[in-house]
Structures are given as C-alpha cells and as structure tokens.
C-alpha cells in the first residue's frame, strides 16, 4: 500500500531504480546462462602468441571470437598456461580444453575426448640458403646442429621431448623462441631449425629482409591434423564442439582465419571428428 505521506521524489526514485534493475536483469540473463569454457593458451606461434600475458594474440583468439559469435550457450575464453604445465592444468580442471593438439604429444595417460578441428599444418626443416645447397641437405640430421623449441615433440625424435634425450642423441640447442631459432640458422649458429610451415610463412612476411635467405624443406617432420582435447567434465561435449567447427567450416570462417597462414582447411573433417576419450 502506498504511503500517502511519502514524498513524490522518493516514489520516482524507487520507480527508476526498479526499472534499472529490471533492465539489468534482462541484459544479464543471457550472459548468466552462458557456460564458460576455459581454453588453454600455451605459446605456439602463430596459433598462440604471448600466452603468459593477459593480452593474447595469434590465431586462437580469432578462433574463439568466431566460436563465441556462432552461438550463445557457451563463452570460450583463453586461460594462460605453458607447454609443460598444460597437462597439469588440464587434469586439475583449470582448463577445459587444449586446442591445436595431438594425443601423441604426452596425452596418452590423461583421460580426454578428441575433436578434429579440420585444420592441417606441417613441421618443416629450415636451413640457411647457400650456393649448391638443396633438398638433400635435410636427408641426414646427424652431425648437424639443431635449433629446437624446448618442450615440443618432434617426429624425428620419436616424439621424445626430454632435453637430455635430445642433447645426447642430437646436437640440439633448446630455446623458447622460434624467432631465435631461425635467426640462429640465418647467422650460422645452427644448421637446421624446425618450425611449422605457418610460422615460417609468418616470419618471412614480418621480416622481408630475409627473403631468399632460408631454404625450406619439402621433407616434413610431422603433419599436424590439429585436434581439440576435451577433459571429461568440460562444460561442452565433443559432439557439440564438433558441430560448431563444422558450422565455421561450412560458412568459410575457418578459411578466413587460417588460410592466410597456409594452414589447410580440410573439407568436411568436422563431420566425423568426435571420437571416444582415452582413459587412464
């Protein structure tokens, strides 16, 4: 019942506050209903750049933006991690998924489900271009100084990423910078570096002064058929995520993001991407 003695200004104030609260609830409702999906951001250029900082760059943020715009049930956000720490973060539930992965990269004993992203890249060998040097230079790695990224799993080493193994069996220098590895090759401090084809393409686009100075192998160390690994308790299921990737592929959004980096978008890959998880 209205208090007849209550000033009109107070009544108006109540009404305004009530309307504001109603509008706020209307706006917040859809956001509150969204389930947050934490995606691990481990340094893997050009996919993830500056993952240890609050501002993320690279292709992963572009992909998550496209996923967020494609639906309203989930909100995908990057949570920083690192190459070695991502396993622990995944098992602890700090991250719900890890993208641009391969189950052979140390995930064999960790429960997960797999979604094929429908994207393909390749790890290639890179040397300094010199007169008379051709593709035969990449046939043998023994006796050559290698510049590798610490923590990465390489095919030529049977995916053994242990620094001691690489140092003992290969003349390998391990760093945390792909730029440094390529510069070591360019300046004669290493004979061969390994990097993704997409990264080498991006490096040469950003450092045009090195055009023609690198010899890139036709030999491929490994082909990346990029996959998403989902933890069992993730807010989104493998089937739901697979349908979202198929939607982005069908509408051309995957190609718009990845094709400029020479990352192939495989036709129809997401239709059959959902597979059973690996158990402990």
Give the predicted meaning of each segment.
Residues 41-45, 120-124, 209-245, 265-279:
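Periplasmic-binding protein-like
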Residues 34-110, 174, 251, 260-261, ...:
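Extracytoplasmic small-molecule ligand-binding "clamshell" domains
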Residues 64-72, 116, 142, 150-175, ...:
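Ligand-binding cleft/hinge of the Venus flytrap
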Residues 61-71, 131-132, 138-145, 152, ...:
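Extended ligand-binding regions for polar small-molecule ligands
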Residues 74-75, 153-170, 245-280:
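Ligand-binding clefts/hinges and TM-proximal coupling segments of bilobed small-molecule sensing domains
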Residues 28-29:
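N-terminal signal peptide c-region/cleavage motif recognized by signal peptidases
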